[in-house]
Amino acid sequence: MLYHLLYPLASDYKLFNVFKYLTFRSIYAMITALLLAFIVGPWVVRKLEALQARQVIRTDGPESHLKKQGTPTMGGVLILVCIVLPTLLWADLKNVFIWLTLLIIVGYGVLGFVDDYKKVVEKNPKGLSPRQKMFWQMLLAAGVGIFLFYLPGFSTELYLPFFKRVHPELGILFIPFVMLVIVGASNAVNLTDGLDGLAIGPVAINAATYLLFCYIAGNAKLSGYLQIPYVPGAGELAVLCGAMVGAGLGFLWYNSYPAEVFMGDVGSLSLGGALGTLAVLTKQEILLVIVGGVFVVEALSVIFQVGSYKYRGKRIFRMAPIHHHFELKGVAEPKIIVRFWIITIILALVAISTLKMR
């Protein structure tokens, strides 16, 4: 909004020339999101408490979690507001990639909100059925995949980190691949959101990493020099990534151990979907497996646990997702959280290093 209102004035007032720079708008989208979280956060927490939107803790989980009973959830509403508003304020709203990503963020957010509302406000422990959630997740992701498939100039090739000449053409398989990336990322973040700050920390780190890749992918010279796919318009997504980083850090202010509020499905589903969409739009889908390694391991631990118990009658872990396994082994919750953050930072550095390893 500000880009369209103020940048045209640059011809008369040189000060407004800064609005053409992605770096400027990305930084201020981040700052705006962070300040918005600080200002609105306490009010959101109070409203959630007034709605009795309190987390129900599993009795079969670690005993240390029982003290979390009654902590407000659905705090992802704050995250969504702190992403969407700064993005609308600082981004170029003529950019179709911005709207595609916001579609997933808001769409998955609404889906998560309905599920959370049924569980914690209407006291329906089942919420939405897994089939219902999967149907809507896949439908929204399919919409993105179909749109991109028919978007003139958008490549349906798969690019691999470390290999500059290996990029197989997916053709029509690009659509189910997009669905796999977006839905998979959404559910992986959802599974990771089991400890205070465990999911939002890596999400912010992932968003910061993709901010860099969005900027490079949208710059013809930089992308050519670093030999990554050039995606015209992708650079504008750096503004949205900046808002995600700011919103993540702002929410972490309240979600750090011991948490004052949980994000709920409204936050985890939308954030994961956003990361998946960013990966697709920048042609860095495989990179998400690296920088989002914590999410991948969390999801795989559940898949392996369920598969092993179903076919072998034995569990691999004491409890899945894997962060609960470490809890039951006696590792303190804050230590697990910080270690997972450290791992994510290392993986982010590895992902960034692929820019020069091709």
Swiss-Prot record:
Pathway: Cell wall biogenesis; peptidoglycan biosynthesis. Its cofactor is Mg(2+). GO terms for cellular component: plasma membrane. The chain crosses the membrane at residues 24-44, 73-93, 95-115, 134-154, 169-189, 197-217, 233-253, 261-281, 286-306, 335-355. It is found in: Cell inner membrane. It is a multi-pass membrane protein. It catalyses: UDP-N-acetyl-alpha-D-muramoyl-L-alanyl-gamma-D-glutamyl-meso-2,6-diaminopimeloyl-D-alanyl-D-alanine + di-trans,octa-cis-undecaprenyl phosphate = di-trans,octa-cis-undecaprenyl diphospho-N-acetyl-alpha-D-muramoyl-L-alanyl-D-glutamyl-meso-2,6-diaminopimeloyl-D-alanyl-D-alanine + UMP. GO terms for biological process: cell division; cell wall organization; peptidoglycan biosynthetic process; regulation of cell shape. HAMAP family: MraY. This is Phospho-N-acetylmuramoyl-pentapeptide-transferase. It comes from Citrifermentans bemidjiense (strain ATCC BAA-1014 / DSM 16622 / JCM 12645 / Bem) (Geobacter bemidjiensis). The gene is mraY.
